[in-house]
Regions:
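Flexible beta-alpha connector loops of hexameric P-loop NTPases
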Residues: 58-60, 201-214, 260, 264-267
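N-proximal, solvent-exposed amphipathic alpha-helical segments enriched in charged/polar residues
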Residues: 2-38
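C-terminal boundary of histidine-terminating zinc-finger modules
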Residues: 345-356
Length: 386
């Protein structure tokens, strides 16, 4: 018995359903949900014309979206040919889209105390302790667990996250995020949404020499204008020390939790304690210490402690003084060639060499963070005495 030929209406409905599986690579939502599909026209003989509207002129994802639309429509049984007419949203349609993406919320910081997103600021006292490397690996490890993760690189003067996440080209230049009106769409790498001041400079050697007010405005804009969507975890890679950016993050996100990165060296531990103390002064909770560069495993199985021992435990002990709940050492990350190579290549070690001891340690730290209870500072508990 011959298979029934679908009617034009049935074919159009099937094509529209297939297009619902096409995801905008920047907004990370179906193109049908974003009103990017303005119509599906079924013509004689199974030819289909799809009216596709992009968000802006020069959309960097245009070729990808058009290809995915063509493939999705062509995969529907009964479709003989696919034509895609590409246009651009008018200002009114684009404004309606940005309003819908914001879910009707007024423009402002997305990550308030009552949001469902867990905000973790990764800080250190000294530079060069591997804070950014720890941040990106934790982000990717959490994303591999199925969480929706974003990273904000607020180390404005020493940005490195785009390179560590593989977002830079052969010249070290990161892609400039797409703007939809006042909304900034963060690039995605390894299933993590990322934004950094390094995406707004034209040359990797450009020195960003801003003072307090500009730094505060930058942090505020990243937290206000960048569309991250619904995240489970947002990690902030802070600059080392206790300067303007740390203070701004404390003011803008007083409910954020803080993760302190140090090395086993006593000098690093001394300074790391200060970064935790400053975080507490703004109401933030220190959830733990990560000891990086903990040792180098030798061929005979012995460990060479290039930076000494005990810095992580000492930092945690100092930050625990006078606290009801002790600050734990969440883990120690050993020195590792694959860890360094992964950073240089833009493939974090938890993804590129998951069996390496450093990757195992970082993944365990990420898992431990997910099992820790989120702080209630600043959150409404929804209790009623009536």
């Amino acid at each position: 018995m011959a298979e029934a030929v679908p009617t034009d209406e049935q074919l159009g409905t099937a094509v529209l359903a297939a297009l619902g599986r096409v995801i905008d690579p920047e907004i990370r939502r179906p193109v049908t949900e974003l009103d990017m599909i303005r119509g599906v026209d079924v013509q004689p003989g199974g030819a289909v014309r799809v009216d596709l509207q992009l968000t802006i002129v020069g959309c960097p994802a245009a070729d990808t979206i058009e290809r995915d639309v063509r493939v999705a429509a062509g995969s529907v049984p009964g479709v003989a040919a696919v034509e895609v007419d590409v246009s651009v949203m008018d200002p009114a349609t684009r404004a309606a889209l940005t309003e819908r993406l914001r879910a009707g919320r007024p423009k402002g910081i997305q990550f308030t105390a009552d949001s469902l997103t867990r905000v973790i600021a990764v800080t250190s006292g000294k530079g060069g302790v591997g804070k950014s490397t720890v941040t990106v690996n934790l982000a990717v490890a959490l994303a591999r667990r199925g969480l929706r993760v974003g990273v904000v690189d607020v180390d404005v003067h020493g940005f490195s996250v785009p390179g560590l996440m593989g977002l830079t080209d052969e010249h070290g230049v990161a892609p400039r995020p797409t703007r939809v009106d006042s909304m900034i769409l963060p690039p995605v790498a390894h299933d993590v949404k990322v934004v950094s001041i390094g995406m707004f400079v034209d040359d990797v050697s450009t020195a960003v020499s801003w003072r307090g007010p500009m730094l505060h405005r930058t942090v505020n804009q990243f937290l206000t204008d960048v569309f991250f969507g619904d995240l489970d975890v947002l990690l902030l890679d802070l600059p080392p020390g206790t300067g303007d950016v740390a203070i701004s993050v404390g003011q803008l996100l007083p409910h954020a939790e803080v993760l302190v990165v140090t090395t086993p060296q006593a000098a690093a531990a001394d300074v790391a304690e200060r970064s935790g103390i400053v975080a507490r002064q703004t109401g933030q909770r220190v959830i733990g210490v990560v000891e990086n560069m903990a040792g180098l495993v030798q061929p005979d199985g012995s460990v060479l402690h290039l930076f000494g021992e005990g810095g992580g435990a000492e930092t945690a002990a100092r930050l625990s003084r006078g606290q009801d709940t002790p600050v734990p050492v969440l883990g120690s990350v050993p020195l590792s060639v694959p860890l360094r190579e992964g950073g240089d290549a833009g493939v974090p070690v938890v993804l590129g060499a998951p069996e390496d001891p450093s990757a195992v340690a970082l993944t365990a730290i990420a898992d431990r963070i997910t099992t820790m209870g989120r702080g209630l500072a600043g959150r409404k508990l929804g209790l009623s005495l009536s």
